[in-house]
Structures are given as structure tokens and as C-alpha cells.
Amino acid sequence: MAAHSYHFVTRWRVRGTVEEVGQIIGDADSLAAWWPSVYLDVSELAPGDEHGVGKVIELHTKGWLPYTLRWRFRVSEVRPPGHIRLEAEGDFVGRGIWTLAQDGPWTDLTYDWQIHAEKPLLRRLSWLLKPIFAANHHWAMARGEESLDLELARRRAATPAERDVIAPPPGPSTMPAGPLLGLAAGIALIVLAIRRRGASR
């Protein structure tokens, strides 16, 4: 696998039906509302058919690290209520597959995300900082599970008073760039020192 290639399999478990959860996951236009820690801006470029196949969404996203990503996806396959496949391009190039399965009162979600990072920062530094970039993805997905659980609770609330007591979803990270740059410089120095020691033997 190339240094800038990534393959993540994320599993969530939330209380609700596949139909409830699938309605939220399949509504890309609402991502910035219920998952604002990651989705800063979402724009629909093409509507797709009655199931959403062919829909094209443009995204501006981030994780806890101090950089943002601009990319888009096209929904290439939908099998209601529990399967959505999308194709990504831009700062990410690859594909993602959502699979939902009912388990009693719970829905188990699996997101299989296989991409190449094409943003210059990620492409050039993945050989060095891949574990940190991977941790950034895991942080984003953990916020997603938390935010989905809150969104399900909001949608079930019977009155405005019930809705008001539900916590808002977590917002974007405000981590400054300094720590990341310092960490990258430190790792680079360690790698260079190891290489020089190996070359001198």
C-alpha cells in the first residue's frame, strides 16, 4: 500500500432502527447540522435519482488537526435501507461504503473507507505522519457516532422542551497549528538521525 493510501473500517452502534439511522446517513445535505465537528460546509451539486444514486455533494471538512479538506462524493449505489456506496474525489480519492444492520433495538453501522490522500500536505507527509493522520480520522469518526446518537434523540423528542435538554453536537476542533508542526519537525529529526546512523555504519 502506498504511503498516502488509507483503509479504515469504522463500526458504530446506536439505538434506533435501520430506517431511522439510514434516513440520517443518507441525507448528505444535513451533515453540517448534525456532525459540525467535521462537516464545515456541504453543497449539493447534483440531486441524483429517487434513491439518491448519482447525487453529487461538495464538502469542506476537518478533523482535530489544524487543516481542512475540500472534496466531493458521488453516490454510486443505494440499497435501502442499509447500504450506501460513494465515490470520492478531490483531496480524497477513493470510495466509502456504509452498511447498516438491525440488532434488536440497536443499529450496527460499518463504514469502509478506502482512499488515497491527494491533498499536498497529506500526500507529501504520509510517509512520516501517517499514524497522526489516521488518528485524525478516528477522532472524526468518534465525533460522528456521538453526534448521530444526539441527532436521533433530537428527532425523537416529542416537544420543544424535550429537545432543549439534548446537548448540541460537538463543534470543530480549535487545535492550533504549532503543536502539529513541532511534532512533525521532531519526528523528521529522529528519522534523519536514524538514517544518518545507518549510513555511517
Which residues does each predicted region cover?
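Intrinsically disordered, low-complexity regions enriched in Ser/Pro/Gly/Gln/His and often acidic
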Residues: 5, 26-28, 64, 91, ...
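Signature tryptophan residues that serve as conserved aromatic anchors
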Residues: 34-35, 98, 113
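Flexible, glycine-rich phosphate/dinucleotide-binding loops
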Residues: 31, 84, 118
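A short, polar/proline- and glycine-enriched secondary-structure boundary/capping micro-motif
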Residues: 69, 95-99, 119-125
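Terminal "cap-and-tail" regions of soluble proteins that handle hydrophobic small molecules
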Residues: 2-4, 14, 103-201
